[in-house]
From Swiss-Prot:
Topological relation to the membrane, as annotated: Multi-pass membrane protein
Top-rank taxon, per record: Eukaryota
Protein name according to UniProt: Aquaporin NIP3-2
Name of the gene this protein is made from: NIP3-2
Transmembrane segments annotated in the record for this chain: 97-117, 128-148, 170-190, 212-232, 240-260, 282-302
Distribution of this protein across tissues and organs: Expressed in leaves and at lower levels in roots and anthers.
UniProt function note: Aquaporins facilitate the transport of water and small neutral solutes across cell membranes.
Subcellular location, principal: membrane
Alphabetically ordered keywords of this record: Membrane, Repeat, Transmembrane, Transmembrane helix, Transport
GO MF annotation terms: channel activity
Native organism taxonomy: Eukaryota, Viridiplantae, Streptophyta, Embryophyta, Tracheophyta
Record keyword Transport present: yes
Residues spanned by motif NPA 2: 265-267
UniProt record similarity statement: Belongs to the MIP/aquaporin (TC 1.A.8) family. NIP (TC 1.A.8.12) subfamily.
């Protein structure tokens, strides 16, 4: 009897378990959702609804169970090979030195030729023409050579860049040698082409020594401030480097040209001096320009911080 009761109770329990309605999810019903947190070891730490996790697990098991039925959607989250950008090899030092020689030769040849044309043709070029010639030469050379050597074309620039870590110290002497040699070569080329060569191609102060020193210091200071701001700061507009540096050369030439020749460049002064044998107060240009360059670059980093 009791066995009958037990069996009937078991049947009642079984029938009760069958008659319980399944839990249904209604759209927008957040009370029946179960959320799980993926452990930090997993690929994600997002909180996902239980039914999404369960569905993803079922989809994964189906892919492993029947690979033949795989679809592009099933492989959507799989890793695919990615083409990494190719790293360009560094430019050899010999090519950088060659670029500095060519660039300095072109710059000095252009400036000296413009000065000679102005003197031989009764001021046809004028100060504005000479300044424009120098600025345009620097602009096109920067556009052409900056990706090879940095297009310094100036020992003062190379010295300042070395002091602040933008040029390896081992590259400094080869750079300066190439720049001076390019200037000397251009000066002798001009001397051989134009007869007679007017001594006006040499930068000689037409003002007092202190004023000349100050002008060369300030103009080189401004030049290196602009170069450093555009060439070394990742936040600068790199597309304007050539135009800005060329405009700075032109501006400084208009300011200091009548007084000192607006050298801003020891190579600009040294090459013509050797070609003509005139060394009047050359120390002003060889000392003031590197000091102004280091001060200009240092000032930019000081106000940037």
């Amino acid at each position: 009897m009791e066995g009958g009761k037990m069996s009937s109770m078991g049947m009642d329990a079984a029938s009760a378990s069958v008659t319980v309605p399944p839990m249904q999810m209604q759209a927008g019903d957040q009370s029946n959702r179960i959320a799980i947190i993926i452990s930090p070891r997993a690929g994600s730490s997002k909180i996902l609804p239980f039914e999404l996790v369960n569905g993803a697990a079922n989809a994964g098991s189906q892919r492993h169970a029947d690979p033949a039925e795989s679809t592009p959607e099933a492989h959507h989250h799989l890793w695919h090979p990615v083409d990494l950008p190719k790293i360009k090899p560094p430019v050899p030092l010999v090519k950088k030195v060659g670029a500095e020689f060519f660039g300095t030769f072109t710059l000095i040849f252009t400036v000296l030729s413009t000065i000679i044309m102005d003197e031989q043709h009764k001021g046809v070029e004028s100060l504005l023409g000479i300044a424009t010639s120098a600025g345009l030469a620097v602009t096109v050379l920067v556009l052409s050579l900056i990706h090879i050597s940095g297009c310094h074309l100036n020992p003062a620039v190379s010295i300042a860049m070395t002091v602040f870590g933008h040029l390896p110290p081992a590259h400094l002497l080869p750079y300066i040698a190439a720049q001076i040699l390019g200037s000397i070569t251009a000066s002798f080329a001009v001397k051989g082409m134009y007869h007679p060569v007017n001594p006006g191609i040499v930068t000689v102060p037409k003002v007092g020594t202190v004023e000349a020193f100050f002008l060369e210091f300030v103009t080189t200071f401004v030049l290196l401030f602009i170069i450093t701001a555009l060439a070394t700061d990742p936040n600068a507009v790199k597309e304007l480097i050539a135009v800005a540096v060329g405009a700075t050369i032109m501006m400084n030439a208009l300011v200091a040209g009548p007084s000192t020749g607006a050298s801003m460049n020891p190579a600009r002064t040294l090459g013509p001096a050797i070609a003509t044998g005139r060394y009047t107060q050359i120390w002003v240009y060889l000392v003031a320009t590197p000091l102004g360059a280091v001060a200009g670059e240092g000032f930019y980093f000081a106000i940037k911080l």
